[in-house]
C-alpha cells in the first residue's frame, strides 16, 4: 500500500492550472519533456523566441495524434463502426466543416517543426496540390458505391463505379505518391505518405470485396488484388526505410531528439503500416466491408526524459548508447505492470524519489510476479521504501509528475517529488499517489499529451484510453543523488492481457506475448507492430490462450526464415502436428523487410472451450537453425482463405492461387498423440 496515499494531506493540483513565470510559461512541449531549456546565459530575447517556437508547434500534435490514433482505433475495432471504412477515413482527413481544411497541412507543419527543417510555402503547396482533387474523387466514388449498394439495379451502375476506381488508382500511384515523397522532404512528408497509402489500399480492398458484383472480369479482380499486394509491400518498405533514414540522422543531434522522433513516427507512421496486411481479403476475408481480425500492437514507446536538459543526465555528458540503455528497455517478452517499490530520500529539506523497482508479470501469467532491476539509489543510501500495487486486471492509463525546478545556482535537487497515477479496471477509476506536494519549493508539473482517448482526439477516461504504463526507468548513476533522469514506457491499449480467442474473428497473437521469461526477443523491423521472437533450434515457444466459447479452429504462423525445416505445434499436448517451413529470405535477421515474411498453414486443428483446464500452445523448432516468429493466427473453421502451394501467402507471379474451405478439410484432429513429446523443462 502506498504510504503517501492520504490525499487530504496534500494539495491536488488542477491539471489545467498554468502558473506562469519566466522559467515555465511556455507550453510544456514536446510531449512529456520537462519544458525548461538550458537557461544559463539565456537572454530575454532568446527566451521569447523559445516561447514563440514552442507555441507554433502546439497546434500540430493534436492533429497528428488524432489522425494516427483514429486510423489505428478504427481498424482494430476499438471505436464503433459507422458507415463504410473508406468513407469514414475520408471524413477524417477532410472534415465536413465550412472552415478551410488544414488536416494535411497541420501534419506536415508539425513534422517539419519536429525535425527542425525549414518548410517553404512553395514546398507545402507542391505537396498538397492534388489533395483537393483527391478529396472530390473519393467523395464521388463513395457516394456512387453507397447508391449502388442500396439498389444495384436502379442507381449508380457498376460500370460507372469501375471507372471511378480506375481513375483513383492512377491518381494515387501517379500523383499522390510523388507529392508526398518530394526530394529532400521525404521524412517531413512521411506521416502524410503513410496516411495516403492507407486510403489507397482501402480503395483496392473494395475491389477485392465488391469487384465481381461490380462487373469486373475475374482477370481484372485478380489484377487489382495483386496491385493491392504489390503496393502493400512497396508502401511498407518505403515507410520503414524512410523512417529509419530519419532516425539515423537524429543520432547526430542527440538522444532526446532521436527518441522523440521515434515515438511520434511510431504513432503516426509505423502503427498505420502494421495494419496494411489486414486489408488483404484473401488472408482476412470480409463480405460486409468490415475487418474481421482481432489484432494488436505490442510495440513500446517512451516519454521524453524528465530532466533531460539538466547537466550530467543526457548526451553529451553520457554517450548516446548509454542514454539508450538507461532510458529504454532492451527487446523483451511483453509485460504487464503490477506495481512499484519506490525509495524516497532527502537532502536537507528536499525530499524526492531516489530509486525504484518495477514489478510485472507476463501475459496470462498473473501467478508469477517478476521484479525488475533496481534503478537509482536504494535504501543503503538512506531513505525509506514504499509500494504501489496494481491489481491483475487493472492498468495505469494516465499520470502526471512533479519534480523540483532546475534554477540558479543549479545546486539543489531536481528529482521527482510526486507522481499521480490514474488506474482503471475498465469499470472504475482510482488514483494512487507517490510522494507529496512541496509547497515551499519550486516544482514543475509534467503531463504526457500523447496519452489520449482511443481515437486520439480527446482526453483519457477510465474506459477510453490509447496507452497504458508498462515500465518506469530511472537514471541515478550519472550525477549522484541530486540529479535523476526519469522516463516512462507505454504500450498500446489494443493488447489483450488474456490472449482471448473469439469465435467470429481471426485472432492474431504476437509471439512476444509468450509466457516464457527467457524467450529470445529481437528488435522488430518496423512494419510488424512490435518485436519478434527468435526461436532457436530445438527450442520452443509457449503461449497461453483463453477460449470464451466452445470452438474449433486451425492455426497458421507468420514467420521469416533463411532455412527450410520442420516445426511441431500442439495445444495442451493434444495431437502434436508436424509441418514444414520453406526459406523466405536470404537476408540477415536484423535486416528483414516486408516481403521476407510469409504465413504458413500448420494444418493443426483444435477443438476446445472454456472448460478445458490447460489452453497452452506449444511450438517447437526442429529446423537446423533459428526461425523468426512474428504472430500466431487462430482461424475459426468455416472461413475461406486464399492459399498458394500450401502457404497462406500470395504468389509473386499471381498464378498459383486457389481457394480452400477449411470446414471441408479432411484433416483428422483426433489422431493419436505423438509419443515424441518430451518435457519442456529441458
Curated annotation (Swiss-Prot):
Transmembrane segments: none
Pfam families in alphabetical order: Endotoxin_C, Endotoxin_M, Endotoxin_N
Disulfide bridge partners, by residue number: none
Highest rank taxon of the organism: Bacteria
Keyword terms, alphabetized: Plasmid, Sporulation, Toxin, Virulence
A Gene Ontology molecular function term of the record: signaling receptor binding
An individual GO BP term: symbiont-mediated killing of host cell
Record's miscellaneous remark: Toxic segment of the protein is located in the N-terminus.
Protein's job: Promotes colloidosmotic lysis by binding to the midgut epithelial cells of mosquitos. Has larvicidal activity against Culex pipiens molestus, but not to Anopheles stephensi.
Family the entry assigns: Belongs to the delta endotoxin family.
Name assigned to this protein: Pesticidal crystal protein Cry19Ba
Organism: Bacillus thuringiensis subsp. higo
Phylogenetic classification of the source organism: Bacteria, Bacillati, Bacillota, Bacilli, Bacillales
Amino acid at each position: 500500500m502506498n504510504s503517501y496515499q492520504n490525499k487530504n494531506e496534500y494539495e491536488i493540483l488542477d491539471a489545467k492550472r498554468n502558473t506562469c513565470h519566466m522559467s515555465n510559461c511556455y507550453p510544456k512541449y514536446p510531449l512529456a519533456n520537462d519544458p525548461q531549456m538550458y537557461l544559463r546565459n539565456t537572454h530575454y530575447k532568446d527566451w521569447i523566441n523559445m516561447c514563440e517556437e514552442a507555441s507554433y508547434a502546439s497546434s500540430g500534435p493534436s492533429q497528428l495524434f488524432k489522425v494516427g490514433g483514429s486510423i489505428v482505433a478504427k481498424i482494430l475495432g476499438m471505436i464503433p463502426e459507422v458507415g463504410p471504412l473508406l468513407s469514414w477515413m475520408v471524413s477524417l482527413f477532410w472534415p465536413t466543416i465550412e472552415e478551410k481544411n488544414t488536416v494535411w497541412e497541420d501534419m506536415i507543419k508539425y513534422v517539419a517543426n519536429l525535425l527542425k527543417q525549414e518548410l517553404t510555402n512553395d514546398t507545402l503547396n507542391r505537396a498538397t496540390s492534388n489533395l483537393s482533387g483527391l478529396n472530390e474523387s473519393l467523395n464521388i466514388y463513395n457516394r456512387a458505391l453507397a447508391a449502388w449498394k442500396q439498389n444495384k439495379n436502379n442507381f449508380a451502375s457498376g460500370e460507372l463505379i469501375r471507372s471511378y476506381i480506375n481513375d483513383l488508382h492512377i491518381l494515387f500511384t501517379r500523383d499522390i505518391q510523388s507529392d508526398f515523397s518530394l526530394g529532400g522532404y521525404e521524412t517531413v512528408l512521411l506521416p502524410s505518405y503513410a496516411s495516403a497509402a492507407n486510403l489507397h489500399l482501402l480503395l483496392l480492398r473494395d475491389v477485392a470485396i465488391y469487384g465481381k458484383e461490380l462487373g469486373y472480369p475475374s482477370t481484372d479482380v485478380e489484377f487489382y488484388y495483386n496491385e493491392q499486394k504489390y503496393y502493400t509491400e512497396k508502401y511498407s518498405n518505403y515507410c520503414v526505410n524512410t523512417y529509419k533514414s530519419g532516425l539515423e540522422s537524429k543520432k547526430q543531434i542527440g538522444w532526446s531528439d532521436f527518441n522523440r522522433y521515434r515515438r511520434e513516427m511510431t504513432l503516426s507512421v509505423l502503427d498505420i503500416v502494421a495494419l496494411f496486411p489486414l486489408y488483404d481479403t484473401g488472408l482476412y476475408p470480409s463480405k460486409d466491408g468490415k475487418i474481421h481480425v482481432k489484432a494488436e500492437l505490442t510495440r513500446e514507446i517512451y516519454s521524453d526524459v524528465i530532466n533531460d536538459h539538466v547537466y550530467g543526465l543526457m548526451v553529451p555528458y553520457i554517450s548516446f548508447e548509454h542514454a539508450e540503455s538507461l532510458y529504454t528497455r532492451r527487446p523483451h517478452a511483453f509485460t504487464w505492470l503490477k506495481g512499484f517499490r519506490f525509495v524516497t530520500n532527502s537532502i536537507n529539506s528536499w525530499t524526492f524519489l531516489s530509486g525504484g523497482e518495477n514489478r510485472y508479470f507476463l501475459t496470462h501469467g498473473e501467478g508469477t510476479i517478476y521484479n525488475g532491476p533496481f534503478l537509482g539509489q536504494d535504501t543503503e543510501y538512506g531513505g525509506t521504501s514504499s509500494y504501489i500495487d496494481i491489481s491483475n486486471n487493472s492498468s495505469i492509463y494516465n499520470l502526471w509528475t512533479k519534480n523540483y525546478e532546475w534554477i540558479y545556482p543549479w545546486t539543489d535537487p531536481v528529482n521527482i517529488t510526486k507522481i499521480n497515477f490514474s488506474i482503471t479496471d475498465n469499470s472504475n477509476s482510482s488514483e494512487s499517489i507517490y510522494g507529496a506536494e512541496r509547497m515551499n519549493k519550486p516544482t514543475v508539473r509534467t503531463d504526457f499529451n500523447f496519452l489520449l482517448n482511443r481515437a486520439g482526439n480527446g482526453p483519457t477516461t477510465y474506459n477510453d484510453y490509447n496507452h497504458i504504463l508498462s515500465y518506469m526507468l530511472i537514471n541515478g548513476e550519472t550525477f549522484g543523488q541530486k540529479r535523476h533522469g526519469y522516463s516512462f514506457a507505454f504500450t498500446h491499449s489494443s493488447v489483450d492481457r488474456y490472449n482471448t480467442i473469439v469465435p467470429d474473428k481471426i485472432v492474431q497473437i504476437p509471439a512476444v506475448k509468450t509466457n516464457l521469461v527467457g524467450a529470445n526477443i529481437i528488435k522488430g523491423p518496423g512494419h510488424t507492430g512490435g518485436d519478434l521472437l527468435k526461436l532457436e533450434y530445438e527450442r520452443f515457444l509457449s503461449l497461453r490462450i483463453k477460449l470464451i466459447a466452445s470452438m474449433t479452429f486451425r492455426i497458421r504462423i507468420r514467420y521469416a526464415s533463411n532455412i527450410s525445416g520442420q516445426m511441431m505445434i500442439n495445444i495442451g499436448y493434444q495431437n502434436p502436428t508436424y509441418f514444414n517451413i520453406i526459406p523466405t529470405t536470404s537476408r540477415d535477421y536484423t535486416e528483414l523487410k516486408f516481403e521476407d515474411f510469409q504465413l504458413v498453414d500448420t494444418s493443426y486443428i483444435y477443438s476446445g472451450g472454456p472448460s478445458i483446464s490447460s489452453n497452452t500452445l506449444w511450438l517447437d523448432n526442429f529446423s537446423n537453425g533459428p526461425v523468426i516468429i512474428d504472430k500466431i493466427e487462430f482461424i475459426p473453421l468455416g472461413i475461406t482463405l486464399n492459399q498458394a502451394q500450401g502457404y497462406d501467402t500470395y504468389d509473386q507471379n499471381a498464378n498459383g492461387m486457389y481457394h480452400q474451405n477449411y470446414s471441408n478439410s479432411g484433416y483428422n484432429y483426433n489422431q493419436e498423440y505423438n509419443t515424441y513429446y518430451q518435457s519442456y523443462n529441458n
